[in-house]
Amino acid sequence: MGKSEGPVGMVESAGRAGQKRPGFLEGGLLLLLLLVTAALVALGVLYADRRGKQLPRLASRLCFLQEERTFVKRKPRGIPEAQEVSEVCTTPGCVIAAARILQNMDPTTEPCDDFYQFACGGWLRRHVIPETNSRYSIFDVLRDELEVILKAVLENSTAKDRPAVEKARTLYRSCMNQSVIEKRGSQPLLDILEVVGGWPVAMDRWNETVGLEWELERQLALMNSQFNRRVLIDLFIWNDDQNSSRHIIYIDQPTLGMPSREYYFNGGSNRKVREAYLQFMVSVATLLREDANLPRDSCLVQEDMVQVLELETQLAKATVPQEERHDVIALYHRMGLEELQSQFGLKGFNWTLFIQTVLSSVKIKLLPDEEVVVYGIPYLQNLENIIDTYSARTIQNYLVWRLVLDRIGSLSQRFKDTRVNYRKALFGTMVEEVRWRECVGYVNSNMENAVGSLYVREAFPGDSKSMVRELIDKVRTVFVETLDELGWMDEESKKKAQEKAMSIREQIGHPDYILEEMNRRLDEEYSNLNFSEDLYFENSLQNLKVGAQRSLRKLREKVDPNLWIIGAAVVNAFYSPNRNQIVFPAGILQPPFFSKEQPQALNFGGIGMVIGHEITHGFDDNGRNFDKNGNMMDWWSNFSTQHFREQSECMIYQYGNYSWDLADEQNVNGFNTLGENIADNGGVRQAYKAYLKWMAEGGKDQQLPGLDLTHEQLFFINYAQVWCGSYRPEFAIQSIKTDVHSPLKYRVLGSLQNLAAFADTFHCARGTPMHPKERCRVW
């Protein structure tokens, strides 16, 4: 299915000697220190002057928007005499950008040996991974800062706001109401277990009572429609890949309780995670038995949970690995209900009953000619024997465990404590996130447009939209022009690629309606939610139900081409193949990615790279299967298809040969990360060329104070610094298994090793690590 993708970028150039050069940073450090001090003093005076006055509602790091720029003439070292001298920008915005870049760098490292260490060594040295984090990166820092803003606006109750916003604040307060959560203990969970047909391991005589009337179809439908848990069979509604103007029912293999199927087999660290997972299950069931005044019966609990783990292990074996699911055309099988039933009988499983029961929750009736799309054919073929092997008790224990697993965070501390060892084995962390951050994240992910409206009002300058739109036009134009360089693609395919690129629609910042006070759409979006400050667990169940049913209703609704696929308060960017649409939420439109107060070299190397990355997703190993209208269609000639695969194989091999010390020397999965690597490489290449074109057409950029770097060098340094970050070993191992992105370090090294322009810019001799003898290129 055409899923949304995340952000990334890439570029090219070739070079000269690898001898040690004079430091890029020498000579300007004293000036920079004085400027930073002056800027901070000026800010202090400004702040003191405004105390007591009403300040604008614009907050946070996106500041100095109206400042006057002041410039000092200076000729950077190493630039030919004939080249025009650039102006040095000394505004607070530029000084802060210079300080950030300087602090993040490690000038003792040779850029041609390890550019990631050169660009990020200072950042890595200064930042220790917080106890609550499994990874800590520039992205995480920006998210932390964004959450501080959200905390302030969610806790602000001085004035009555619109209903959607008030509901978000009520949900936040219920999450923060820890005294009530502790007082209620496990009772909210025990109450809901009765609704779902009981958890056999945590009750007596299930087999002889509730179990006698148990039906798999109805249980799966209940989990799907009321709790948004698509267990055993993943049924969901989405745009039809072959006709993006309509929605259709999809049937696919499900997710599992642990992040990757690989954790269910093999030894080493996988065994440790498995053992911790089993103990987690046993501990939760034991607590619930105690609270229900039942005997501990540790033998029964252990036996039941071992059976659950065995069942889930068989399900894991039945699933197809992600690296074998990249060809969406091969995955897609549309059929009627009769064919579905005849092909996948599952020992009497009634597909029509299951699907109709799910849809009945939103009062939708199946049509006689209703079609479904089956993605998970190999899984469904294997599922029949699994269902036949395990008892109703074990299957029900598993279904309810998946609901319980999802809701542990909504319960009292004693339940959270049961997952400590599991989280340590999986993420390397033993300390829970501070409560307010957990609650901010929860509310933002469940009420993204309500929270987004608060964030945009507080921290997003509206004029950013037009500037980003101009950057999109520039990068897209370069993508189209660059098609002429591709010898592996014939003219017919290039023409269709050009048409698709020019048809990509963009969404920037936020949907307009979330700020329109007279537009009731935002309030109507959450009209079915009614929260109580004392009922956090029940509030979370409401969100699950409303989310599930909002999705199910789409089956009979027209596809809205203007629908936003993500909220505004998000530090990320996305591409949707079904919509041929790129999205840049307000949360990512801030330094180091973007600011009107920093040189364009940084903007092109930041958000420009992200723009190129998302555009390139339309032509990666998944996006290439969709046409300009978002319909799955093979618009490629046989010649171009064959050569695309050959170009891609180069990248699969390149990234697959990176051995990651943090992940027990495991290699990056070149197959799983192919789409993101293609986008990274294409994104930085296009952004760099767009920057050079902008300058060639008369664009005047400024130098940053204290940094004797060319504009081109600043571009690449800012690109690399976007990815500064470090991992805990446990999470590194998990990332190798589950993340479709390469590790941060290899996102930088891999893309820049493939760019001749980078080697030229830093004068890297052929044969040095950053100027390899062979390079890969797709776009």
Swiss-Prot record:
Per UniProt, residues of the Peptidase M13 domain are 88-779
Cellular localisation: Membrane; Secreted
- Could you say which cofactors this protein requires? Zn(2+)
EC number in record: 3.4.24.11
Modes of activity regulation: Inhibited by thiorphan and phosphoramidon.
How is its cofactor bound, per UniProt? Answer: Binds 1 zinc ion per subunit.
State the name under which the record lists this protein: Membrane metallo-endopeptidase-like 1
Originating species: Homo sapiens
Q: What is the lineage of its organism?
A: Eukaryota, Metazoa, Chordata, Craniata, Vertebrata
